Amino acid sequence: MTQTITSQRPFEANRDAESPNRNLTPITTELDGTDRLVVGGCRLSDLAERYGTPLYVLDEATVRATCCAYREALNKHYAGPSLPIYASKANSSLVMSSLAASKGLGLDAVSAGELLTALRGGMPGERMVLHGNNKSDEELLLA
């Protein structure tokens, strides 16, 4: 039986099913028995209490699924060779580089720091792109 958005996510029950604003929450989002928001098995109020706010929380399952969706869309709609590229400026971290690499994505970087972070996170150098202007000789050599 197929579940509707409403049955899967009662807190999104009033969203238009055709709206681009549907399913904005991570795929593991749920309400616990006390109607507290939970993502990836972690109650968000507990995370806020422990780490303070504002707090940026990512759901690994959602990141992995999104990476796969981009790769699959390119494979389906573009006959030539392609490589979906993660924009490291969104979150230049070892974990995000590792997740993107593990799902077959490439990565764009704007600095030596982003390149080094991606390499340390497991992103193969041949799947990285250095872009932007005003690059130092060291950054160009590293790329």
Regions found by a protein language model. Name each.
Residues 1-142:
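A charged N-terminal "starter" segment
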